[in-house]
């Protein structure tokens, strides 16, 4: 599984309250959440993002309130992957559960700039910055998590397993 796109870059401690503000949590419709994604930190995000783009951040991405609305909003906005130095653990699990690929890599998170063209190979964990001609070794998903991601989330994965029985 691979992702390829243009980078949208953010700093440390991007919390779920700025990914999708609480005032929009009355909806669970991914399309509606996508329209408000990153609104409090980057007003132009929804106008700039294209299908397949990649979000890069520094430390503790997805901290704050536990809400699956945050990874849903990011995924529905068109982002194909989030790269960060570290993720808040609850965000990490929520992202996997809804099928949003994420990968931890300190060097990539620090070196990749907004606007760079990046490709990620999730099977190997290799992140390639096509703009700068550099590669980084990120943390590859364990096999069971790769299966969840390929199924586009935990619920789809479980349904596939049930259908196979």
From Swiss-Prot:
Enzyme nomenclature, EC number: 4.2.1.33
Coiled-coil ranges from the UniProt annotation: none
Alphabetical GO biological process terms: L-leucine biosynthetic process
Entry's Gene Ontology molecular function annotations: 3-isopropylmalate dehydratase activity
UniProt xrefs under SUPFAM superfamilies: LeuD/IlvD-like
Superkingdom of source: Bacteria
Keyword Lyase: yes
Cystine pairs: none
Pathway: Amino-acid biosynthesis; L-leucine biosynthesis; L-leucine from 3-methyl-2-oxobutanoate: step 2/4
Reaction(s) catalysed by this chain's protein: (2R,3S)-3-isopropylmalate = (2S)-2-isopropylmalate
Entries under Gene3D superfamilies matching the protein: Aconitase, domain 4
Alphabetical UniProt keywords: Amino-acid biosynthesis, Branched-chain amino acid biosynthesis, Leucine biosynthesis, Lyase
UniProt xrefs under NCBIfam families: leud (TIGR02084), LEUD_arch (TIGR02087)
Assembly and oligomerization: Heterodimer of LeuC and LeuD.
Family membership noted in the UniProt record: Belongs to the LeuD family. LeuD type 2 subfamily.
Protein task: Catalyzes the isomerization between 2-isopropylmalate and 3-isopropylmalate, via the formation of 2-isopropylmaleate.
HAMAP family (alphabetical): LeuD_type2
Protein's name according to its UniProt entry: 3-isopropylmalate dehydratase small subunit
Organism, scientific name: Lachnoclostridium phytofermentans (strain ATCC 700394 / DSM 18823 / ISDg)
Gene from which this protein is expressed: leuD
